[in-house]
Amino acid sequence: LTCKTCPFTTCPNSESCPGGQSICYQRKWEEHRGERIERRCVANCPAFGSHDTSLLCCTRDNCN
């Protein structure tokens, strides 16, 4: 599986997930500097946090 890995709206970077991590993840939240984005590979989809504005977990290449 290959997942996007950069903290920008448009993300050209991706990486192959290590063994045991078969989910692509994207989380967005608001800070005083504006919207923040986190993208990476995970083993389990995390819970929706109280400050999150969106949370995406998917299992296709570069789906996050």
From Swiss-Prot:
Subcellular location: Secreted
InterPro entries cross-referenced by the UniProt entry: Snake_3FTx, Snake_toxin-like_sf, Toxin_cobra-type
Tissue: Expressed by the venom gland.
GO molecular function (one): ion channel regulator activity
Taxonomy, superkingdom: Eukaryota
GO CC annotations on file: extracellular region
UniProt keywords, alphabetically: Chloride channel impairing toxin, Disulfide bond, Ion channel impairing toxin, Neurotoxin, Secreted, Toxin
Disulfide bridge map: 3-24, 6-11, 17-41, 45-57, 58-63
Parts of the chain that traverse the membrane: none
Role, per record: Allosteric modulator of the GABA(A) receptor (GABR), possibly increasing receptor affinity for the agonist, thus enhancing receptor opening and macroscopic desensitization. In vivo, intracerebroventricular injection into mice results in periods of reduced basal activity, followed by bursts of intense seizures and death.
Note: Negative results: does not bind to nicotinic acetylcholine receptors (nAChR), muscarinic acetylcholine receptors (mAChR), acetylcholinesterase (AChE) or to receptors for glycine and glutamate.
Similarity-based family: Belongs to the three-finger toxin family. Ancestral subfamily.
Protein's UniProt name: Micrurotoxin 1
Lineage start: Eukaryota, Metazoa, Chordata, Craniata, Vertebrata
